[in-house]
Amino acid sequence: MHRRCAWYACVGVVVAGISRAPAQTTPRVVFNDAHLHLTNYVQRGITARDVLRLMGDSVARSTLFGIPLQQEWLDAVTGANAPTYYLHSDAPLYYYSFTDAYIAMQYRSLSAAERQRFDPMITGFNPRDMYAADHIRRVLRTFPGVFEGIGEFTIHKEFVSDKVRPGPASLLDAALDSVLSAAGDIGLVVLLHNDMDVPFPSDTAKPAYLEQMKAVIRRHPRTTIIWAHTGVGRVVRPVKHHAAVIASMLRDPAFKNLYFDISWDVVAKYFVSSPETVRAAAALIEQYPDRFLFGSDAVAPANGRAWATTYELYAPLWAALSPETSHKVRVGNYERLFDAARRNVRAWEAAHPEP
């Protein structure tokens, strides 16, 4: 059997999608998805019901959020060629707040039982705007009973940050502190993309954004923060001694509120490119098994195979982890964080109804 097909078979994934294990076996949860985009950079995508169909029995729960940035289509830049991704055009990106209403309406289109499988997130705010926290509270009051977190939103991201209008966000901006303080007060989980370093750094330079990110996390000890992709990106490679840098944070009580997601197909190579990188990643996760979550970072997956790609790419890592640790990363840690957020946010909403 082809290696790819063998892997899909062993996790009960069939060509039609992340579906059900064979009928003669008991269905089992393969993963919960801490990082799923329902829409793309031009606000097109799939419905919540489409996601539910793809989940089958193999995916128990998933986050649900759009992308807060809209790629402009400028005739002077690409003519009749409509860009659908930020790499398709030099035209700017701008913040698109309607994404939150769209996600809320998708969630509300489901039955009460179906809603239990989703954990929607607010993304449609500008993190450099001091009114961003007001937007978050307004969305919660407008759509009570829906949202449980904020993100994925971006501060520093390789090709993206410089395209955003009116300008790039910053870890030093008081608006970000306002957003994170609000999230902590309300009980929202935060999923934040922030590259630890710049693309193609010099060999002697320190990671450009590591110390700033540490300072942000220290300032908000009551806010649950998931650092997306462990701070790496498409062309942002792991920093020197990357695993040791993460370990130093996870053993520091000042970062007890910090978690990392293992996500995005384009960064899987950094974790599984060799037996050595697999061993290093597995050793780190085994040491701190409660601090990592799996996320696909799939963008409006058209079918189950597209959704399963990231999970499959991390196959060597799953094989290297103990069954207990693997289950925590794939399933258990998600449940713990988002169950708590669901309780806390619903309590905040009850105490702060719409005026």
Q: Which residues does each PLM region occupy?
A:
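Active-site beta-loop-alpha junctions enriched in small/polar residues
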Residues: 37-39, 67-68, 123-127, 153-156, ...
